[in-house]
């Protein structure tokens, strides 16, 4: 899980979603997981 000021999809399978007011990226590749902090 990477915590970044700006989250962007890295590959085609990355999805940007909002969960409890936080922006997250979920993906099949665990290295691509991100959240905004």
Swiss-Prot record:
Annotated keywords: Ribonucleoprotein, Ribosomal protein
Keyword rRNA-binding in annotation: no
InterPro entries attached to this UniProt entry: Ribosomal_bL36, Ribosomal_bL36_sp
Top-level lineage group: Bacteria
Signal peptide from the UniProt entry: none
Protein's GO biological process: translation
One Gene Ontology cellular component annotation held by this UniProt entry: cytoplasm
Keyword Cell membrane: no
Gene Ontology MF terms: structural constituent of ribosome
Family: Belongs to the bacterial ribosomal protein bL36 family.
PANTHER family listed in its UniProt record: 50S RIBOSOMAL PROTEIN L36, CHLOROPLASTIC, LARGE RIBOSOMAL SUBUNIT PROTEIN BL36C
Identification of the protein by name: Large ribosomal subunit protein bL36
Organism the protein comes from: Halothermothrix orenii (strain H 168 / OCM 544 / DSM 9562)
Gene assigned in the entry: rpmJ
């Amino acid at each position: 899980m990477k915590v970044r000021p700006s989250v962007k999809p890295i590959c085609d399978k990355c999805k940007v979603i909002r969960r409890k007011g936080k922006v997250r990226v979920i993906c099949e590749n665990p290295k691509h997981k991100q959240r905004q902090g």
